[in-house]
Amino acid sequence: MKEQLLTYCKQLRLSAMFADNAMDATGETNQEYMLEVLKAEVTYRSIKRRNLNLKKAGFDSIKTFQCYDFEDITIPPDLTIDLLKQAEFLSRQENLILYGRNGAGKSHMATAIGVEACMQGKKVMFYKTAALVNELVAAKAEGSLLKLLKKLSKLELLICDEWGYIPFDAEGSQLLFQVIADCYEKRSLIITTNIEFSKWNGIFYDNQLTTALIDRLVHHSHLIIFGRDSWRFKHSLMNHSDK
């Protein structure tokens, strides 16, 4: 009987675990038995999907919010720590911009949110921003850019870590802008950076492109500021908004 179950599971694209559960499950009625078997299959698939999402996300290491220190971190009034931990902003395709000095915990927070999103069954990718640009440039040279952009378009969260650490040439800037523009109001972004908006012209090749990129990032975004640079960064943002 076990072999027959495995055969039917394969034909119906059910997991081999379904056959094991079917052999072990009990129930006073047929309906209770079937409910137990199906519930076990749903649980198995959910765990498998979470693990696959974590594997594909490309995190440097798995981080969580356990023992994370929120002291000296400025969170905007429309967010709470609990909502942040739950990655609640993803439901509205909103963005996070994490700004502060090196070593302040920006990458840790971005990763922890990404891990939580994976645990919720969402598709996430984590990139060092320079690595993403290099991958885009290489894909264009190899004729596979559309394939990469299609892959990115299926995400629910794209994390760009170390934004602005390395300046980009014209091609890299334009390709990164294309990715950000494609995300606009469709999927969420998390950006980690230690560079003020007023200095982003030094990162990207073109001032006009820089302005357009900032506009798309800031709209529907929450600013989370690490350390004591809160006023300076907010002032930089206000100056940009007035232009």
Where do the model's predicted regions map?
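Walker A (P-loop) phosphate-binding loop of P-loop NTPases
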Residues: 103
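Pre-Walker A (Motif I) flank of P-loop NTPase domains
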Residues: 91-96
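N-terminal pre-Walker A segment at the start of P-loop NTPase domains
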Residues: 63-87
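Conserved lysine of the Walker
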Residues: 106
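Hydrophobic anchor at the beta1->P-loop junction of P-loop NTPases
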Residues: 98-100
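Interdomain "pre-motor" coupling segment immediately N-terminal to P-loop NTPase/helicase cores
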Residues: 6-61
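Hydrophobic positions on the alpha1 helix immediately C-terminal to the Walker A/P-loop
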Residues: 109, 113
